[in-house]
Amino acid sequence: MVQGGSSISIRKKNFCIIAHIDHGKSTLADRFIQKAKIISDRDFKSQMLDSMDIERERGITIKSQAVTITYKSNDGDFYELNFVDTPGHVDFSYEVSRAISSCEGALLLIDASQGIQAQTVSNFYMAFEHDLEIIPVINKIDLPNANVDFVKKQIKNDLGLNEEIAISISAKNGIGIDDLLEAICKYVPSPRGSIKDPLRALIFDSHYDSYRGVVVHFRIFEGQIKMGDKIRLMHTNSEHLIEEIGIFKISLERKDTLEAGDVGYFIAGIKNISDVKIGDTVTLCDFPALSPLEGFKEVKPVVFSSVYPVDANQYDDLLKAMDRLKLNDASLTFEKDSSSALGHGFKCGFLGLLHLEVIQERIEREFNLNVILTSPSVRYKIIPKKGESYFIETPEQFPGNEAIESVLEPYIKANIIVPTEFLGNIMSVCLLKRGVQTNLIYLDTKRVELIYKMPLSEILFDFYDKIKSVSRGYASFDYELLDYEYTDLVRLDILVNGDRVDALSQLVFKDSARTKAIGICKKLKDEIARQQFRIAIQGAIGSNVIARETISPVRKDVTAKCYGGDITRKRKLLEKQKEGKKRMKMVGNVEIPQSAFLAVLKSNDN
């Protein structure tokens, strides 16, 4: 937040709504929109700011969405409220951090029936570190098991906030919304900065319009911008002419001028997607700022998977889709990749498994492309016997065991908050996932916080679902990355008739390699069609075969035309068939159907 200068307007307030997943952020945003009457009742629908079908179907927010409303307070003043509805899932915490960077205040939403959860704490610290004014909001007070007094104690004891200013609401029923709006006007600081200073505005998001090019979302900290201005993006040093500026009111609303404190958008005929970088600073060409604003901390992907088009002819379409998604999702990384089995595609980096699933669904829905994703993995560190250490993300990059001194894998610090009655269940799950308990804190008589150190690879697939299952849905989970630690990792290769299938190779923990290999071999046996020769499916670590399945050959009745007669005639035909099968086995390539690859990938998810 820019300090110094005078308040631009006492009637402008910028804030975001942050909370643990499913605590009611989008529902509260809906009530604000209805209160401001910026959309007719006929056009209104729930989750108004969740524009993607996948968000509505899953009931989650994936993209932060900004909107501007006007509110008349009890003192008669009109306030322009710019607010951002943010995601709650840990995979999209980068979206939350960008929203926080463009605000002066935050509404910390807490479910009255569940209390403070892991992501509540994580988002609180993020807002606290950015020096935001935090207003605690207790939601869902209409629920039969709501306990407002207990949650107020948590706000005081766990977060150190003043529980007296906490606002109790029911976003679903519209209870307490007026009190909350009054608190926003009272407690959230007005933005600071002078409109006389050179323009400095922070790009916090963007999306692509097929007709007008890139639509840039930005927050102005100093100066002003108007139609026809020539701007410079300070990071890429590219210059553009402003064609349209405006604010977000569900749809885009044009304005002639925007000034310090405003959150809005601009369109400048930018067709080259690479010209726009999230975190870049916008300034004017004829009155430039001397230095850019502090951008966003570059986020690093933690989960890696390769994406391939089912139809190889759609590679160029997939490239365009990835470029468009990257514009709208700065946390997505990708580079070109190829596989002998799956063709040309892209090696992608994601923030988590939900992020991966969302990107896959967006590719298929928004761009009408069918794609295959390889088994997700993390980034491992290789220390060779000779030379410097390096990182790998795919099994193909894994060198032979004879060349490796040691392997390191990324570890996380897992924070799990759970009712005390489910403590034993959670500890059992963490133990199975190679977790090491580092702390156990009783938050009160009913809740305990468990802190574990565990490998990132162990939480990729089913960890979140398992802790939810064994706690009847009450456990909450958040994590942060730690450093790398030594591990006993091996590359599991799958061989079909002695030939390694690159697309099926996996990096696995040595103790679980045999179980994994047996499962894959059985899956392939069910999926690969029988041939006229025997097919051997093997799981191997280096030259050691640890699992095997055999597909028996189809037997063609070559003696069918022999009606009676000499038995030696039949024997000759059978011997000839036997020799033919030997030759066929030597030169025959086994065709592995796409369904087999999908079956193996699906088994990894389970």
Swiss-Prot record:
GO terms for biological process: positive regulation of translation. One of its GO terms (cellular component) is plasma membrane. Residues 10-192 form the tr-type G domain. Coiled coil: none annotated. It catalyses: GTP + H2O = GDP + phosphate + H(+). GTP binds at residues 22-27, 139-142. GO terms for molecular function: GTP binding; GTPase activity; ribosome binding; translation elongation factor activity. It comes from the Bacteria. InterPro entries: EF-4, EFG_II, EFG_III/V, EFG_V-like, EFTu-like_2, G_TR_CS, LepA_C_sf, LepA_CTD. Its main location: membrane. It is found in: Cell inner membrane. SMART domains: EFG_C. It is a peripheral membrane protein. It is an enzyme of class 3 (hydrolase). Keywords: Cell inner membrane, Cell membrane, GTP-binding, Hydrolase, Membrane, Nucleotide-binding, Protein biosynthesis. Its EC number is 3.6.5.n1. Belongs to the TRAFAC class translation factor GTPase superfamily. Classic translation factor GTPase family. LepA subfamily. Required for accurate and efficient protein synthesis under certain stress conditions. May act as a fidelity factor of the translation reaction, by catalyzing a one-codon backward translocation of tRNAs on improperly translocated ribosomes. Back-translocation proceeds from a post-translocation (POST) complex to a pre-translocation (PRE) complex, thus giving elongation factor G a second chance to translocate the tRNAs correctly. Binds to ribosomes in a GTP-dependent manner. This is Elongation factor 4. It comes from Borreliella burgdorferi (strain ATCC 35210 / DSM 4680 / CIP 102532 / B31) (Borrelia burgdorferi). The lineage of its organism: Bacteria, Pseudomonadati, Spirochaetota, Spirochaetia, Spirochaetales. The gene is lepA.
